[in-house]
Design a protein with these regions (language model features):
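Terminal connector regions
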Residues: 335-375
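Catalytic phosphate/nucleotide-handling subdomain of diverse soluble enzymes
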Residues: 84, 156-237
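Intrinsically disordered, low-complexity Pro/Gly/Ser/Thr-rich segments with frequent PxxP/GP/PP motifs
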Residues: 308-336
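Short, solvent-exposed loop/linker segments at the N-terminal edge
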Residues: 275-282
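Asparagine-centered strand-capping/turn motif at beta-strand->loop junctions
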Residues: 289-294
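Short, hydrophobic/aromatic beta-strand segments
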Residues: 296-303
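Accessory "access/gating" subregions that flank catalytic or transport cores
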Residues: 17-38, 47-57, 66-71, 85-179
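Catalytic cores of secreted or luminal carbohydrate-active enzymes
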Residues: 223-272
Length: 376
């Protein structure tokens, strides 16, 4: 869905699209060739989605945001999306920004740059009254030539929240004045404060009433009113609270109006335990999991590709009704003078009465380089 609906933007989104078209799935869809943008704000800006549909379920919100983030990012960005999703979910019951930050730090690896940055910014905000000085400290230690880099921008956002005094206008203007990725810094801070204040307070304090919005994604909405978007967010939230395993139902009443397409009877997923890149005379192994929720036994096979030898981990892969199985595919690249960048394979399972399920996956042919020099 993310691939189909997301507009064809550059940066990390473009690298995700290219990797997905190569058959590469998360987490490597957010890693391969994405060195410059992998730590960008493209996924932390999506964190509010998970926090708002899972009020007071911060660990689940953080977990889902991690899945979301690995589509097109890696490492620091994903950590900070988890951190922000936790804060948003927790903000349904806590309004103190310092408390929210401290609680959300629990999902950050303590040896990560993300944890260090959050700790630094909160300490600097306690030590210094001048937000411009704090901004210079953030740039000095975490500044990056990519204006969307998450470390500097989440640092700015935290500073603005801590120094904005809960005033959504002051905080938003400060975030914009800080520069860099301002739609994200003002957006993240504004969404969190808006949640804490609520629609009634926004109108009373600032005269902010229902308004319209614009999006660049490819889908149709019943309207472009923020109130309708909020209403639909609540509906999705009720559905998650009612149906997601382990979710604590924090909202009473309300009708679950979300109808999802039926789950497929057979689900196949592939996992890369090693990078999905291959060269001549090399081999890699791809792991698969399959769930058969049908009433029929299914059996599977593998389609190969020129220049490759492919082997299943067993001579025959059969999965009984209402059961699951795991298997492996070993891909050997023959000795060759050239290798395509995009190499798509397919695992297909079939059962009686026309039951079929297929999973396409890819490996990337490593590039060959010819080095000249050195020259004096």
């Amino acid at each position: 869905v993310f691939y189909e609906k997301n507009i064809k933007w550059p940066g990390e989104y473009a690298y995700f699209r290219k990797n997905y078209e190569r058959g590469i799935r998360p987490p490597y869809s957010g890693i391969y060739e994405n060195d410059f943008y992998r730590d960008g704000m493209g996924c932390p800006i999506r964190a509010e989605i998970w926090g708002m549909i899972l009020p007071l379920n911060p660990l689940i919100a953080a977990s889902l945001s991690e899945i979301d983030g690995t589509l097109d990012h890696f490492g620091t960005s994903v950590y900070l999306e988890k951190f922000w999703a936790y804060m948003v979910s927790e903000a349904f019951g806590e309004s103190d920004i310092s408390v929210l930050i401290e609680r959300a730090k629990s999902v950050l690896p303590q040896d990560s740059a993300a944890f260090e940055m959050v700790s630094d910014v909160t300490r600097w905000c306690e030590e210094f009254s001048d937000e411009k000085k704090i901004r210079s400290y953030i740039i000095g230690k975490y500044g990056h030539c990519d204006c969307t880099n998450a470390l500097q921008n989440i640092g700015f956002t935290l500073c603005c929240l801590l120094k904005g005094g809960g005033d959504i206008i002051k905080t938003g203007v400060m975030a914009c004045d800080f520069g860099f990725d301002t739609d994200c810094t003002a957006g993240n801070s504004g969404a969190l404060l808006g949640l804490i204040l609520g629609a009634k307070k926004l109108k009373e304090l600032y005269g902010i009433d229902d308004c319209r919005y614009k999006v660049t994604l490819k889908y149709e909405r019943r309207s472009d009113l923020v109130s309708d978007l909020a209403d639909d967010t609540v509906k999705v939230g009720l559905h998650f609270l009612n149906n997601f395993a382990g979710a604590v139902k924090t909202v009473d009443g309300g009708k679950d109006e979300i109808t999802l397409p039926p789950e497929p009877l057979v689900k196949i997923a592939n996992y890369y335990d090693e990078p999905p890149y291959i060269a001549s005379d090399e081999k890699i192994t791809v792991r698969f999991g399959i769930e058969n929720n049908s009433e029929k036994t299914i059996a599977g096979g593998l389609s190969g590709k020129e220049n490759f030898e492919c082997k299943l981990s067993a001579a025959k892969i059969a999965v009984e009704p209402k059961s699951a199985a795991e298997f492996f595919v070993e891909i050997n690249c023959k000795r060759t003078e050239w290798l395509a960048d995009k190499n798509i394979f397919a695992v297909k399972f079939e059962g009686k009465s026309g039951l079929t399920a297929e999973r396409k996956f890819g490996v990337i042919g490593k590039r060959r380089y010819l080095v000249y020099g050195p020259f004096w």
